[in-house]
A protein has these predicted regions:
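C-terminal helix-rich "cap/oligomerization" subdomain common to oxidoreductases
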Residues: 1, 66-68, 276-330
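Active-site loop of classical SDR/Rossmann-like NAD(P)-dependent oxidoreductases
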Residues: 37, 261-275, 289
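N-terminal Rossmann-like dinucleotide-binding module
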Residues: 1-49, 171
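Beta-loop-alpha module in the N-terminal Rossmann-like domain of NAD(P)-dependent dehydrogenases
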Residues: 19, 49-107
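A contiguous active-site-proximal alpha/beta segment in oxidoreductase catalytic domains
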Residues: 97-154
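Contiguous beta-strand/loop segments that form the cofactor/metal-binding neighborhood of enzyme cores
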Residues: 168-241, 271-285, 321-330
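Mid-domain beta-loop-alpha active-site segment that forms a flexible
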Residues: 120-127, 150-181, 293-294
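Hydrophobic residues in well-ordered beta-strands that form the structural core
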Residues: 55, 92, 117-119, 143, ...
Length: 330
């Protein structure tokens, strides 16, 4: 292997462009080319970064050892599969695929080919998220909120697969227990898919997690609160700050609470994610967000989607019945 890992970015949309920029600037990797079925779009990115552009990613086989797969979700499986079959290590954007069968197939293929398969759950690479994992011991209750103004992106999927899956993945990494029950409710607002959702997860160890995500908001807010024996943690992902409250005294009657505020430097999470992927390829070690973990997050997100869609159908049916009743009674 050369000094720099030869890589390509497959898919030069919004996220793919960022991937290409980070890889081009990396001292550990060489951006060999970018690929997109929309050649003009790929050429625009390639020209800015000084690399060739192709419309068929297969033209790059034999020239690269790793790839960022940043195509639309429904194409994740086909593109990642062909790369893995050729022994190319893959960093695939979240969610890993759009179904469990295809996710399982990718994980198995990566293992068989001894390739690194990393899933792009970006939140894991923020400084405050790394600190959070050091402080969380036995979570009893988790409350998570992720809301943002409407961007018009990722409207081909609901808000669970667009935004909430980030927090589902983080919660699953904090709670070492199987999921016992799952329910979700929400509604479509600006798109044909649900744009807001609140999900409630009950784990076998008794922990409860409530996760809210919305892509229809007047502001951006990303926070999480974790309650565990003798301590409470509040995370603000926007300001990269962590507040920790602990019982300062002994005994049930003790009222003193010790509060500590921690702030973390704003880091380039995507740069760290790509750097971690490159290190895993070079050192042959398991990624922070492996294919298996990406699959687990997808499974939970699909359960949430199923519950969410059932709720939406119920609301629509009730609204339709009420409308008919008003019409008959008029």
């Amino acid at each position: 292997m050369s000094d720099k890992l030869p890589m390509a970015v497959i898919g030069t949309g919004h996220f793919g462009t960022y991937h290409a920029q980070k890889i081009a600037a990396s001292e550990q990797a060489e951006l060999v080319a970018v690929a997109d079925i929309d050649l003009a779009r790929a050429e625009a990115v390639g020209e800015r970064l000084g690399v060739p552009a192709v419309s068929d990613f297969r033209e790059l086989f034999g020239k690269i050892d790793a790839a960022s797969v940043t195509v639309p979700t429904q194409a994740h499986f086909d593109v990642a599969r062909e790369c893995l079959e050729r022994g190319i290590h893959v960093l695939v954007e979240k969610p890993i695929t759009d179904g469990l069968a295809t996710a399982d197939a990718l994980v198995e293929l990566a293992n068989n080919r001894e390739c690194i398969l990393q899933v792009g759950h970006l939140v894991r690479f923020s400084g405050v998220a790394e600190a959070l994992r050091r402080h969380v011991t036995r979570p009893l209750y988790i409350d998570s909120v992720r809301i943002a103004p409407f961007s018009g992106r990722s409207t081909d999927v609901n808000v669970v697969l667009d935004l909430m899956i980030h927090d589902i993945d983080l919660v699953l990494s904090l709670v070492d227990s199987p999921i016992l029950a799952f329910d979700a409710a929400g509604a479509p607002v600006f798109t044909d898919h649900e744009d807001i959702c609140t999900a409630r997860i009950k784990f076998a160890n008794g922990c409860i997690a409530t996760i809210t995500a919305s892509r229809i908001s007047f502001k951006t807010e990303r926070r999480m609160r974790i309650f565990q024996p003798s301590s409470y943690l509040s995370v603000n992902f926007d300001s990269q700050s962590l507040s920790i409250a602990r019982r300062a005294g002994d005994g049930v009657s003790a009222t003193a609470v010790d509060i500590r505020e921690e702030s973390y430097e704003e880091v380039d999470a995507l740069e760290r994610e790509i750097g971690a992927f490159i290190a895993c390829v070079r050192e042959g070690r398991r990624p922070i967000v492996s294919g298996e973990e990406g699959r687990r997050a997808l499974e939970a997100a699909l359960i949430a989607t199923r519950e969410l869609q059932a709720h939406t159908r119920f609301v629509m049916e009730v609204s339709s019945d009420q409308g008919l009743a008003r019409k008959v009674g008029s």
